[in-house]
Amino acid sequence: MKRLISCLTIICALNASAAAETTSNPCSRWISFLKPVCQRFHQTWTEGHDDMYFSGYAWHNRYVYSNEKIKSYNETAWGGGLGKSLFDEKGNWHGLYAIAFLDSHRHLEPAVGYAYLKTASVNKDLKAGLGYSVLVTSRVDYDNVPIPGALPWAALFYKRITIAATYIPGSSREGHENGNVLYMLGKISL
């Protein structure tokens, strides 16, 4: 519960910070080579659509884990979150998100991050995207220390609904298995 409250506090603080920013150039204090990053974040936050995320599946790679291990893991990674996203002038997708879900050991795992997808239109309503996400998460089995990361991300967009997936790489050393999980999530643009 503390982690959920922490995630919500971060979201509220970011929203308050964005609302309080009244200057015409909110990224003026950023180092010059990071200004485009700030400007894209600001654009996504102020012009983007509100999103509701939901998760529900985490597939543990059967080539890495034993049947006994897989049976002990939670593959129904129920959770949800909020975000903001937009398609830029080139049609590529940018998203800011804060989510929390049940990890492989049924512990609550929060994550906040940014995702970028290079998209291709299949037709007017259907797009496919491939890109990455950079995020910060924390896990009980790592003493709840904030852990930064970068992951591949793929998605299918249909009107306001998105189905996305990422693969969390890991180690397959015997006795030290971790990662190697396909994580699925969905998003509805409000």
Curated annotation (Swiss-Prot):
Residues at the active site: 60, 103-104
Domain of life: Bacteria
InterPro entries on file: LipidA_acyl_PagP, OMP/PagP_b-brl
GO biological process, one term: lipid A biosynthetic process
Site (Role in lipopolysaccharide recognition): 69
E.C. number(s) listed in UniProt: 2.3.1.251
Record's GO cellular component terms: cell outer membrane
Catalyses which reaction(s): a lipid A + a 1,2-diacyl-sn-glycero-3-phosphocholine = a hepta-acyl lipid A + a 2-acyl-sn-glycero-3-phosphocholine; a lipid IVA + a 1,2-diacyl-sn-glycero-3-phosphocholine = a lipid IVB + a 2-acyl-sn-glycero-3-phosphocholine; a lipid IIA + a 1,2-diacyl-sn-glycero-3-phosphocholine = a lipid IIB + a 2-acyl-sn-glycero-3-phosphocholine
Enzyme class at the top of the EC tree: transferase
Signal peptide: 1-18
Molecular-function GO terms, alphabetical: acyltransferase activity
Keyword tags: Acyltransferase, Cell outer membrane, Membrane, Signal, Transferase
Subcellular compartments: Cell outer membrane
A Pfam family of this chain: PagP
Family named by the database record: Belongs to the lipid A palmitoyltransferase family.
Main function: Transfers a fatty acid residue from the sn-1 position of a phospholipid to the N-linked hydroxyfatty acid chain on the proximal unit of lipid A or its precursors.
UniProt-listed HAMAP family: PagP_transferase (MF_00837)
Quaternary structure note: Homodimer.
NCBIfam families: PRK11045.1
Protein name as catalogued: Lipid A acyltransferase PagP
Name of the gene this protein is made from: pagP
